[in-house]
């Protein structure tokens, strides 16, 4: 049985995925787990760039998603991405963080996408 936190996380991943699909991206993989770390979403942009996406979903007030993805988390994401990329042809990559905050009154998601967080979010 899924926990409330797992349902919230899955909902956030669905919302984040739709954001990328609306921008013509293609889903390559989802919820990839290795002993060194996990990857929430892996998408290929129309430009060909493969994006490893970390999704952070919260209820209520805004939160600092940059603090939620610290150096340790980035290291785990990089290691997992390297494993996922093994044996695949070279492709440009980037790491994004999608912060989703659900409005406490309406339940509507507010979405902020931080692109290329490894090189300073844009």
Curated annotation (Swiss-Prot):
Transmembrane segments: none annotated. It holds the Pfam family UPF0102. It comes from the Bacteria. GO terms for molecular function: nucleic acid binding. HAMAP family: UPF0102. Belongs to the UPF0102 family. This is UPF0102 protein cgR_1859. It comes from Corynebacterium glutamicum (strain R).
